Amino acid sequence: MFQDNPLLAQLKQQLHSQTPRAEGVVKATEKGFGFLEVDAQKSYFIPPPQMKKVMHGDRIVAVIHTEKERESAEPEELIEPFLTRFVGKVQGKNDRLSIVPDHPLLKDAIPCRAARGVQHEFKEGDWAVAEMRRHPLKGDRSFYADLTQYITFADDHFVPWWVTLARHNLEKEAPNGVATEMLDEGLERQDLTALNFVTIDSASTEDMDDALYAEELADGRLQLTVAIADPTAWIAEGSKLDNAAKIRAFTNYLPGFNIPMLPRELSDDLCSLRANEVRPALACRMIIAADGTIDDDIAFFAATIESKAKLVYDNVSDWLENNSTWQPENEGIAQQIRLLHRICLSRSEWRHHHALVFKDRPDYRFVLGEKGEVLDIVAEPRRIANRIVEESMIAANLCAARVLRDKLGFGIYNVHTGFDPANADALAALLKTHGLHVDAEEVLTLEGFCKLRRELDAQPSGFLDSRIRRFQSFAEISTEPGPHFGLGLEAYATWTSPIRKYGDMINHRLLKAVIKGEAIARPQEDITQQMAERRRLNRMAERDVGDWLYARFLNDKAGTNTRFAAEIIDVSRGGMRVRLVDNGAIAFIPAPFLHAVRDELVCSQENGTVQIKGETVYKVTDVIDVTIAEVRMETRSIIARPAA
């Protein structure tokens, strides 16, 4: 009798519409309960039984109940699941499989089975890729997943690499394919094989894409020729190899090995500017005045070169610092090093006054054994030879940016617009509290940005610099010429790494059109999105593998008194993050390790400080001594505490 009663239906509808609801993201805790975070200020408690219906990170709508003045959330509708495709470790019990997602806040095993077409016989400990198929908020009884790909077995020494690449859906190996002969591009190549071109790289580098040659002109000015490997001489636009490179967008450099953008036959051999091998190249010739200014008369041309020496960064740096047993093999090579050094100093000086120079940070190199074990982590400071190459590449990229802008009006540009205009007033207010007065309008111009950066670089510590970083916009890849505030340059277009960057291959094709005086179409916008997304994934993969290797390396230091110097890089409500100076590892110091009485402790992300009883005890950029309290291998996290 009540079944089709319209009054009852109306009443139900009314009750439903009057019941308070909230949309937010589920945050799990290790205690079984959770919270529905609606925004930075508001969250609702989710009791343990209700947490069984959801997963950490799910975006949901929940009904809000109030009982004895206490509010709680009952999950009702799934807006967006946190897990769709994921990696995890397989568990097997009584012929039933389940998978535990590889995520610090997801501890529960999800029942699963091998998807159709997956041949592997899964067993305990295997790593796999899975896809969620069922969710309790979608009317299913429980969570359920399909295993769509076998990654590797539990004891594989190379788990960090294979699991990380699978997580980010990145390629594991070099692309297939060969290039049999050079294309006829209708380009006249200047024969520069007699000139003393040299490459300067790490000892282990095989994919050498830049060679340098310098000479002094009669009037004392220096002429620099930058010759760059020429993969577009082998790879036709739209070909299978070109499309594979377009998808990869970059060579993926991970600790221990790389996954190239091009087949190794090209990247490490046919295109690589190997010593004493004749190679096609795209070249740029520029004239540099004594004060480092680049003359407007910039020439781009196709060439054939033969590198006369594969030089190594440390050898060249030691030799220039008069601290070397190594010697250049002849006077011609020695003269090249001296001239390139002069160019480096004058260009560095010019950039110091007219653009911006980055502070040198060391690169950290993992020394790995045969089985992927970490033998050592070496901090490699950026020395004078690194700077010679860096200054030459920046000069060459600046030349390409100008030529592409003036001749075509487009290219693949690296664009950075400095501060987000919406943040300009807040930025000026923050700087004022630290005694720096800037005009909110002026700081949005390239000149104003450079002026502020120079003032910040002159500060006794990097504390203020770290505070304003959050106001900066991100660098972007654009087909439209635009300034690069981070470098302090009016425009910047890279073409010096075409073996490892697809955007540089595009710029090569554009520069060749300029050389031939031909019209060419503007690159499609979607390619810049693909490159930005791939760059993001490659960086995450490098970080993830690094975290795993750092955890392995520091595992035996946990609970010992071994002290490490560490720079504070971030403060949050829960504690602070530090970077170990000697090896680059990131560790977390929980608030209770900073001070036992919670009420006397204030950790402020806003100010980048930790106060105890009202006194600032720690701040971002401080370097302190720490010991390793714990290494959690399952989450690859390192917990440190201030050294006593």
UniProtKB/Swiss-Prot annotation:
Known EC number: 3.1.13.1
Keyword Protease recorded: no
GO biological process, one term: mRNA catabolic process
Compartment list: Cytoplasm
Principal location: cytoplasm
Protein keywords: Cytoplasm, Exonuclease, Hydrolase, Nuclease, RNA-binding
Disulfide bond positions: none
UniProt xrefs under SUPFAM superfamilies: Nucleic acid-binding proteins (SSF50249)
Record bears the keyword RNA-binding: yes
Domain S1 motif, first and last residues per copy: 561-643
Gene3D superfamilies: 2.40.50.640, Nucleic acid-binding proteins (2.40.50.140)
Record's signal peptide: none
Any GO MF annotation of the entry: exoribonuclease II activity
Source organism, top-level taxon: Bacteria
Residue ranges that the Swiss-Prot or TrEMBL entry lists as coiled coil: none
Catalytic activity field: Exonucleolytic cleavage in the 3'- to 5'-direction to yield nucleoside 5'-phosphates
Residue intervals of the RNB domain: 189-516
One GO CC annotation: cytosol
SMART domains recorded: CSP, RNB
Function statement: Involved in mRNA degradation. Hydrolyzes single-stranded polyribonucleotides processively in the 3' to 5' direction.
HAMAP family: RNase_II
Similarity section: Belongs to the RNR ribonuclease family. RNase II subfamily.
Protein name: Exoribonuclease 2
Name of encoding gene: rnb
